[in-house]
Amino acid sequence: MERAGPSFGQQRQQQQPQQQKQQQRDQDSVEAWLDDHWDFTFSYFVRKATREMVNAWFAERVHTIPVCKEGIRGHTESCSCPLQQSPRADNSAPGTPTRKISASEFDRPLRPIVVKDSEGTVSFLSDSEKKEQMPLTPPRFDHDEGDQCSRLLELVKDISSHLDVTALCHKIFLHIHGLISADRYSLFLVCEDSSNDKFLISRLFDVAEGSTLEEVSNNCIRLEWNKGIVGHVAALGEPLNIKDAYEDPRFNAEVDQITGYKTQSILCMPIKNHREEVVGVAQAINKKSGNGGTFTEKDEKDFAAYLAFCGIVLHNAQLYETSLLENKRNQVLLDLASLIFEEQQSLEVILKKIAATIISFMQVQKCTIFIVDEDCSDSFSSVFHMECEELEKSSDTLTREHDANKINYMYAQYVKNTMEPLNIPDVSKDKRFPWTTENTGNVNQQCIRSLLCTPIKNGKKNKVIGVCQLVNKMEENTGKVKPFNRNDEQFLEAFVIFCGLGIQNTQMYEAVERAMAKQMVTLEVLSYHASAAEEETRELQSLAAAVVPSAQTLKITDFSFSDFELSDLETALCTIRMFTDLNLVQNFQMKHEVLCRWILSVKKNYRKNVAYHNWRHAFNTAQCMFAALKAGKIQNKLTDLEILALLIAALSHDLDHRGVNNSYIQRSEHPLAQLYCHSIMEHHHFDQCLMILNSPGNQILSGLSIEEYKTTLKIIKQAILATDLALYIKRRGEFFELIRKNQFNLEDPHQKELFLAMLMTACDLSAITKPWPIQQRIAELVATEFFDQGDRERKELNIEPTDLMNREKKNKIPSMQVGFIDAICLQLYEALTHVSEDCFPLLDGCRKNRQKWQALAEQQEKMLINGESGQAKRN
């Protein structure tokens, strides 16, 4: 029984796909003809286009730019420089700070840490005005025993609520007067000078019945330690009860001679703190009544009892004054720290602020800061000088020319060499510095009396970077010059720590600024030389303006494309056609001049002395990407930004390739190896890509919004890094597994990123898919580059290269190619074909070339066997 032929309906169904394919070929031919005959196309559009067609043309080319918070335009300057755009990686790993205050202590109602002064300036230093205190109750002078207890309680109450040493001691003396009835009372406090030598200063002098606090506290008398009655009591810590002062050899009658007062009997007692240290001396003079005008044992007991209260008062007051002083010091140091880290741009400005702070706080006449010359340690590179009269001025320059010669460098030089502070109470009496004799007798304002000089060290404490010199500490009330004391030394020692930090930070900032300025100049010069020549740009622009052949005419949509017959200028025209046909020029408002210059600049930055990884390889990678997008039907799976980034990445992925791989860069200890921990050359290629994109006249991304710009750069970087085969091998397993399980989804952002990386590798390796004659020729170029690297490894690194790089193993190329296809290529193109069946030509070409290389490998093996057997027969 004969089989019936196909019905008419079946024949019609079979003919329809053939007619559709023929119709598509006719349309492609017409479109290619129109692209090649632009004058006719333009004339036809002008004559035949309707309003609907024009509106549709506009609607097709409207590029919607999302509004972002940072702004739509004008980002090319702020984001143009990769150095400015890349955020700094935070590699710091701070340890757990030492707890210095418990969490519960923060809940205590303390004063605010940061306060505002009367002018509204934020400061750590609180207002110095004291809170108003309750006035002292006047003493009562009842003589009965019961009332003495009430007076003691009253005195204890005053001591617990007041910290004014002078007022409290004055009241204590008035209480004492009611018991021992002396004519005069005096209070002397123990002090120390800068040399830790003790002396006595009167806090109350000649307190008498009816005297006021102001009268007895104005006179200030200094007594030497262990001299006179008071000095002797202070030194020994034992009381003295003297009946006749003039009969005691320790008595100094000079005060009587000055005041005209006649001293007869003296009761002098030490005032001690809880550690039994003498902190003061109290003196009662001339017993008024009873016992022949001399002080009795009862007077001594009563005097000692009340002086115990004076000891408590002095101790509490000293603790309070010390805490206030430390608090003020810490606040000043905090203000200084804030000042230092607020200003780091100018060394002169920060030193002016430091000097002004020191002069204001320490009440000195002059402050000079010497900066050590880094190149010559025996001299100073700069000197900053300020005087107290300049505090109210707003001068920006500290050192004036007419003052420079009056600054004495000798003390600073001495301190720099010894690395120890120097405190001279009176320079005219110091025997260590003979040059100071020139100041003797000089009473003008330029005279140096007291001096404090401290080294400024760096953070490691082993190098002096400067010296701070203070001249003439002034009395706050009288303006007289006085010596610097130990407290001044300690404060300045803490002060210069912050000064050292400020100086170091500012010097580092200035050094970084200079380095950045040099880098900017270098980048400017590099950008100029990296950019294409203007004549070449104008030539390409004029050719592109006249006519750019269609993609079909140029055959750049074919996976079997070859560039061997094209000139460099023609490859640039092909690149323009790729950007045009992918609608990138229209969608992102690219200027033709800028696009032409960018393409030529990219071409220029590929090294011509590299056999394979040059401009032609980059162009072929971009052509394969274009063919995959167009003929492989991948374009409709991607966004416009992704297409733009992929094409830029394909053209730029091997910029400035040196003809060697990452392994050679690492083993040769090339400076590039110090910049990146992996994918060394790929990171360098991306940096070169950024440099060209941001060079003047090459900014093809200037039409993007800020968010689009950031997104595009991110995709470009990921795509270029994906061409590192080490990363490809690491990530391909996940991609292949998704394809195998039929779970691949381009809507997933991570899978989309993974697919773009695989697509970049497929295009980068596309030479393995070309027709056999093209594949053979490219393989020779690759082998030439690899063998050149092997020669360099032997010569420069003194190592034996691998077979892939070994010129002596050239006969193994076919077998190595087969191994490369099996290990790297085949599975990739199989997976890509699963994503888009129209990419099958890549897989087919790869399989055919494997067969060719396999045949050559077998032939090579037979020749090797035959050669060995023939050699054996001859032997």
UniProtKB/Swiss-Prot annotation:
Question: Where do the coiled-coil regions begin and end?
Answer: none
Q: Where is the composition biased (Polar residues)?
A: 78-101
Q: Which UniProt keywords apply?
A: Allosteric enzyme, cGMP, cGMP-binding, Hydrolase, Metal-binding, Nucleotide-binding, Phosphoprotein, Repeat, Zinc
Annotated metabolic or biological route of this protein: Purine metabolism; 3',5'-cyclic GMP degradation; GMP from 3',5'-cyclic GMP: step 1/1
Q: What class of enzyme is it?
A: hydrolase
Q: What is the effect of changing residue 775 to Y?
A: Changes substrate selectivity from cGMP-specific to dual cAMP and cGMP binding and hydrolysis
Q: What is this protein called?
A: cGMP-specific 3',5'-cyclic phosphodiesterase
